[in-house]
Amino acid sequence: MAKVIGIDLGTTNSCVAVMDGKDAKVIENAEGARTTPSMVAFSDDGERLVGQPAKRQAVTNPTNTLFAVKRLIGRRYEDPTVEKDKHLVPFSIVKGDNGDAWVEANGKGYSPAQISAMILQKMKETAESYLGEKVEKAVITVPAYFNDAQRQATKDAGKIAGLEVLRIINEPTAAALAYGLDKKDGKTIAVYDLGGGTFDISILEIGDGVFEVKSTNGDTFLGGEDFDMRLVEYLVAEFKKDNGIDLKNDKLALQRLKEAAEKAKIELSSSQQTEINLPFITADASGPKHLTLKLTRAKLESLVDDLVQRTIAPCKAALKDAGVTAAEIDEVVLVGGMSRMPKVQEVVKQLFGKEPHKGVNPDEVVALGAAIQAGVLQGDVKDVLLLDVTPLSLGIETLGGVFTRLIERNTTIPTKKSQTFSTAEDNQQAVTIRVSQGEREMAADNKLLGQFDLVGLPPSPRGVPQIEVTFDIDANGIVQVSAKDKGTGKEQQIRIQASGGLSDADIEKMVKDAESHAAEDKKRRETVEAKNQAESLIHSTEKSLKDYGDKVSEADRTAISDAIAALKSSTEATEADAEDIKAKTQTLMEVSMKLGQAIYEAQQAEGGAAADASAEGGDNVVDADYEEIKDDDRKKSA
């Protein structure tokens, strides 16, 4: 049976794992790393780079290197959080045809789901290389506080990448699975997950194979990226103060500052002070300018203190919703790279009154949990029951724009709830049902998931028609809606078409685009391999021709030189073709066979001459005297 893989699709880094016997195992990528940067870059010639290769060239190609795209997934272009991000990233965030936030590289627009799909493809290839077989199914993690649109967009990304997404699982829940799989005693745990772009807190009861989420809360726009940006803003301000130059509009400088900020932040988790040194950051009439600055841990902590404090309110809300106090939490599990920051650990300790548990790898634990869930779905992992919750209340807009809740937040999923509604006016033949998700009292203040019209109602006085609306949340946390007119018995299944999101046609087009890109990538790799082989052959043949050319006829020399020239021309062509290079490589190999034969004969002749010389000198060889030493004697003398 083909393996189902577990993927942690992170804001900053992604990770893939698989069940290996009874244990989940993280798979190393082609670069030998256990995590892959969630970055995609497009070079000027259209080549697509994913992961570490994309990160390596980010400084020289800032406008076409896309990162932290997960923060945009499932969001509208007008979203205030998107507006904020627009001014902080070197690449362009544009408005998609559907009104969603898209990104642009080399003048072409991409949906965040498409970029995420490219990262998922890299994860898929990593797993396939390790397993030696095709991978078609996966469990993908999302922040617990993701809404329906964000979950649907993540599922779309999986489809575009050529994966059947068996389950969307919440990141803190996945971490709890990996942490508690071998725990038999009942425990109440808190999973504090501060990653690259999102923050989640989940309270769970675990024990004897049952993982029950009691509550979840969070902030989908709070993470390591915000900490980096806060430090970048500080560096820009300090440089302006010292040099009078504003680096805010210099995209190349901003990318260098971002890399330096991330590095400094990581270093300050284990040391009290670090130095940021960026030579030639910019130049003015007086010459080049350099940025050199000493940064202490205390200064960093003061810069980001409000960001760390923002995690406290969701933690308190989650405790309240779960009906437990901080003292009743047996263990606090830290997840996400930002949880390594001493200030974060200090705040967690103060909040929960105990040292947080640091026994799991915060970068890998989510992927391991996803692999365990994949094992559960595949039947390889037995006696595990996972009960998750919906993070946000679900309801509809009723008279006066009020948000009427049907399913409260932290309801265990999957779940189904029905409620009967009626018309607001006489002889109303259609009703518009607007479905929203959120915690505000007015529908307009919550996230509109979508709307649909129920038409063909028989003319009646207002309040008479009985329309039963059923909301169904599946195990992925994705919403489906159906409506039934009780008067006529007519039932209609309605799939919410999100106010934004990708249509089936969009997804199909992107799937084809991804497939053609995979074919292009394969073709490009074949061309590079063919070029390498050709250039190696050209080099060795030219050397042999120089050393032994006089051993073959002039006609053979000309044929070899012509074949070399033809192969060089093929490898240097702008649109180099692998098949053409291979054919010309074969031709060169064939015409240079006589040269190879001549070299072999010349070397044989040289070998024969050397043997004769050795035989002549044989009379002068002196026999050496020797004495045999037995093992026992050797041991005594040692």
UniProtKB/Swiss-Prot annotation:
Database matches in InterPro entries: ATPase_NBD, Chaperone_DnaK, Heat_shock_70_CS, HSP70_C_sf, HSP70_peptide-bd_sf, Hsp_70_fam
For bias kind Low complexity, which ranges apply? Answer: 604-618
Q: Where is this region: Disordered?
A: 604-638
What's a single GO MF annotation on this record?
A: ATP-dependent protein folding chaperone
In terms of CDD domains, this protein maps to:
ASKHA_NBD_HSP70_HSPA9
**Keyword Nucleotide-binding tagged:** yes
Q: Which PROSITE patterns does its entry note?
A: HSP70_1, HSP70_2, HSP70_3
Question: Which key words tag this protein in UniProt?
Answer: ATP-binding, Chaperone, Nucleotide-binding, Phosphoprotein, Stress response
Inducing factors: By stress conditions e.g. heat shock.
Record function comment: Acts as a chaperone.
NCBIfam families registered for this protein in UniProt: PRK00290.1, PRK05183.1, prok_dnaK
Q: Which family does it belong to?
A: Belongs to the heat shock protein 70 family.
Name of the protein described by the UniProt record: Chaperone protein DnaK
Organism expressing this protein natively: Rhizobium etli (strain ATCC 51251 / DSM 11541 / JCM 21823 / NBRC 15573 / CFN 42)
